[in-house]
Amino acid sequence: TCMAFAFCTAASAQDNFSFWKKDRAYAKNSFSINTGGPSQSVGFQFDHQLSKKTTVSVHYGESVPIDNGVDINGVTYTGTFGDASSWSGVNISYRPIETLQAFRVTAGIGVQSLNGRFDDPDGNSYHWHDGGVFTFTGFGYGLRPVKGVRLGVDIGLIKSGGGVVYTNGLTMDANSRALDFQIANSGGWYPNLQLTAGWGF
């Protein structure tokens, strides 16, 4: 319900403030803040118009650590996901439809360091890490290149090299559980929903 409300709010605002209308001047640049998921995060973004249809965006974000429980093969792990996790990158957005310029398709590349730290019932610790290069593909609505307030929503997929798991446990159980943990979390595919508010200038 919240996502639908945010999407409708962004869509309505952008429809009312189209950049071809006289009350909204064209803007070459903008600065934005955003929040995304599935893991809660906050980020900053600078946009520059290569043309009225094409935008290059430079972004940086950090995950908000959350306490999380994970059950894998009958073993419950407790800990924190998103600890000391951040990413940065560059996206290119293109507006292919002349009469619906709020709609855009986006592709990008960046680097990330994602971390999770968990303990099993026997006291063994596990560190999940997914780092290195990632790519993003998706589509969005809003963030037209206008001066003043800009709103937008984006949906897409992030692809990374996949996570690895390290453990301080020296027993066979700990090593086996680390392998199970890695197999369950090594896909490297992450859905992403992002809400953005910015200022064009």
State each model region's role:
Residues 1-23:
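Cleavable N-terminal export/targeting peptides
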Residues 4-6, 24, 47-49, 142:
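Generic structural signal for beta-strand residues in well-ordered domains
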Residues 11, 17, 29-31, 56, ...:
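Intrinsically disordered, low-complexity segments enriched in Ser/Pro/Gly/Ala and basic residues
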Residues 22-44, 55-63:
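Transmembrane beta-strand segments that form the barrel wall of outer-membrane beta-barrel proteins
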Residues 26-29, 72-76, 120-125, 175-182:
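Extracytoplasmic loops and strand-loop junctions of Gram-negative outer membrane beta-barrel proteins
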Residues 48-151, 194, 199:
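Gram-negative (and chloroplast) outer-membrane scaffold detector with strong preference
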Residues 144-201:
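Predominantly the C-terminal beta-signal and adjacent terminal strand-loop region
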